[in-house]
């Protein structure tokens, strides 16, 4: 799966609310998409695990291979694999720009980064997956941050964002059972 460019409301109807994915809301049709959507079935255990993995992929805008790579890196750490995985995803540069309020959605933040509008510690960075660290200073050109709710690990002044402390699981804007994702990638053998 490459970066998803298709209908976003269909994904929201299937997986539930994904705040960074799009600003659109499924107000006309609230059910599951598809011809046989009215026939609700109980999800199997595997379907629940796969749905958790897909939520992470769509929310953070990454591919299956990228998520597997993050999982392998998180598995090497001494901390809990699931929490470490979420921390790594949360500190991606495109996500930090989105959470700081410089972009309305994650794809818009990714575009800001790719088009060279973001500097980290004075150096232009065009890689959306750049891993931000504590005390990194991120500068966004000619954009004013919105009055969105800032997470406690970010500090915003004018066009500058600073990560002041490591990410905690409680501060995430997105709820997912990370243990299901860990179980999926352990089973797959990533």
Curated annotation (Swiss-Prot):
Q: The organism sits in which domain of life?
A: Eukaryota
Show the GO MF annotations.
rRNA binding; structural constituent of ribosome
Q: Does the keyword Glycoprotein apply?
A: no
Q: Where in the cell is it found?
A: Plastid, Chloroplast
List keywords of the entry alphabetically. Answer: Chloroplast, Plastid, Ribonucleoprotein, Ribosomal protein, RNA-binding, rRNA-binding
Q: Which Pfam families match?
A: Ribosomal_S4, S4
**UniProt protein name:** Small ribosomal subunit protein uS4c
Gene it is expressed from: rps4
């Amino acid at each position: 799966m490459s970066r998803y460019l298709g209908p976003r409301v269909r994904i929201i109807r299937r997986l539930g609310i994904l705040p960074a994915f799009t600003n659109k809301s499924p107000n006309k049709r609230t059910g599951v998409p598809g011809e046989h959507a009215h026939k609700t079935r109980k999800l199997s255990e595997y379907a629940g695990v796969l749905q958790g993995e897909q939520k992470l992929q769509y929310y953070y805008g990454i591919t299956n291979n990228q998520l597997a790579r993050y999982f392998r890196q998180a598995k090497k750490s001494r901390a809990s694999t699931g929490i470490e995985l979420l921390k790594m995803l949360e500190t991606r540069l495109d996500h930090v720009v989105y959470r700081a309020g410089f972009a309305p959605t994650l794809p818009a933040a990714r575009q800001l980064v790719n088009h060279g509008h973001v500097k980290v510690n004075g150096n232009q960075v065009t890689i959306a997956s750049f891993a931000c660290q504590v005390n990194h200073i991120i500068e966004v050109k000619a954009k004013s941050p919105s009055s969105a709710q800032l997470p406690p690990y970010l500090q915003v002044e004018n066009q500058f964002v600073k990560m002041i402390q490591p990410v905690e699981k409680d501060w995430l804007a997105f709820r997912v059972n990370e243990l299901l994702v860990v179980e999926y990638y352990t089973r797959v053998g990533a």
